[in-house]
């Protein structure tokens, strides 16, 4: 996204799907990471969850969330207190509702200038055989 620095605003919203049993708590944990360590901590935490999540339906173990927070440099007890308090659950629920209201029914879902793009797209497809974000964003910036 460095190509679009200063031109594109990149925003992420939580939309944990119910069939991923740990997704809602993982979303809360990511919000706790952001509260305690800012954007950098959010992205480190978020990216590590996705790197380590198994695709066999079990996801990322909930008991690994606090150690992961410590691993990325967050205060372990502050993170645990935030996560255990459930204070991020309303934020996650609100983001899910906003997504549903905007037509999101699954992930990934992306909006470019308010237009919903459902499903995964490559950033760039030099063959132009499929839609890609670069083409969509470049058109929106014209």
Predicted feature locations:
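Structural alpha/beta surface segment adjacent to cysteine/selenocysteine redox centers
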Residues: 1-70, 138
